[in-house]
């Protein structure tokens, strides 16, 4: 009688995590409005003590209608002064604490790049989660995939500081 070792692939070991995540992603489609209301309430609560949040009274806002009524749509140029202050280290301007990361646009308006603030919370809750969700959906749609069992190429943005 021979001994056979069962070798589990990395993909098969982590697949249950992705199945669980896929159920949460499906819920986004069936409960989108409820989830968006909760996210807005969380963001308003988090930003209530910032300069921007105090200016527009985030603390008293209870729903999207309050937000839409009190906070005007702003252009990048109207926000640039706030963003520049944040880039120079000022805290609690548009978001609580210090924002250290900025996404740099390719410059579509006025031929100049724009710096979009990316908080630590935003980095984790959207950028990182978005990558995980893309893999989750891929594995769901390709159940025979062995994505993590071989080589992979991952492209990302620069971590080099931009001093301009």
Residue ranges and their predicted role:
Residues 1-104, 110-164:
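Nucleotide 5′-phosphate-binding alpha/beta core
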